[in-house]
Structure formats: C-alpha cells, structure tokens
Regions:
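Conserved acidic carboxylate
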Residues: 8
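Two-component/phosphorelay signaling modules centered on CheY-like receiver
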Residues: 11-29
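Acidic, metal-coordinating helix/loop segments flanking the phosphotransfer/catalytic sites
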Residues: 30-48
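Acidic catalytic/metal-coordinating carboxylates
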Residues: 33, 58-62
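Hydrophobic/aromatic residues positioned on beta-strands within the core alpha/beta folds
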Residues: 75-78
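C-terminal output helix
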Residues: 99-111, 116
Length: 118
C-alpha cells in the first residue's frame, strides 16, 4: 500500500480520513498546515499527497504544485463552493467535500496507478 500525506486542517475530517486510509493498509502521515506538510515532504517517503485547498496560511494548490515538482502525485479537496471551482481548474485530481470514502479510495487508486504509468 502507499505512504499518504494527508494535509487537512479540520481535525474531525483528518481523523476520519486517516483512520479509513489506515484500514485499507495505507501508512498515513497527517499535517494540519502546508508548512507542516512541507517538513514531512522533505523528510518522509510520500507516495501521494491528499491536500485540502483552503487552509490557514499557504493554500493547498501551492502545496500541490510543490509536491508535483518533487514527483509526488497529489489530490486536492475542498468543501468551499468558491474553492471547488478554483481548485477544479488545477491539473490535479479534485475531490469536492463532502465525499464518500469509497470515492476517495477509487481516486487514490487511480491517481497512484496513473503516476506509475506516466
């Protein structure tokens, strides 16, 4: 399974998603800010990043671009209607909140598969 960096500032969402991904066999590292995520990206093996678009400080799309430069596939998420439109314009897979955990699982699998075939 994959090493996933979950970047989410809502602690409830972070807990639910992290626990779900762990039950699927993924190793999950959680960060509540882009700054914290950048530290993990520099020091931890990451196969995929799951990033909330709207966070305090640096926006998720900027962090996604940084992860992309490191060769790490990234999925963006958001529940804010304005950011749903903005983030869906980026070249990264996008998952609007609220989402079904089964849809998250499918998107992670397809994103990881695509990154291995590119």
């Amino acid at each position: 399974m994959a090493n996933i960096l979950l970047v989410e500032d809502d602690s409830d969402v972070q807990t639910i998603v992290s626990e779900f991904l762990a039950t699927l066999g993924h190793r999950v590292t959680s960060a509540s800010s882009a700054e914290q995520a950048r530290c993990f990206l520099a020091s931890e093996p990451v196969d995929l990043a799951l990033v909330d678009c709207l966070m305090e400080g640096e926006q998720g799309s900027s962090l996604a671009e940084h992860a992309c430069k490191l060769g790490i596939p990234t999925i963006l998420t958001s529940g804010d209607p304005h950011y749903i439109e903005t983030c869906s314009e980026h070249p990264f897979p996008f998952l609007p909140k609220p989402f079904r955990l089964s849809r998250l699982d499918e998107l992670i699998a397809s994103t990881l598969h695509k990154s291995k075939t590119d």
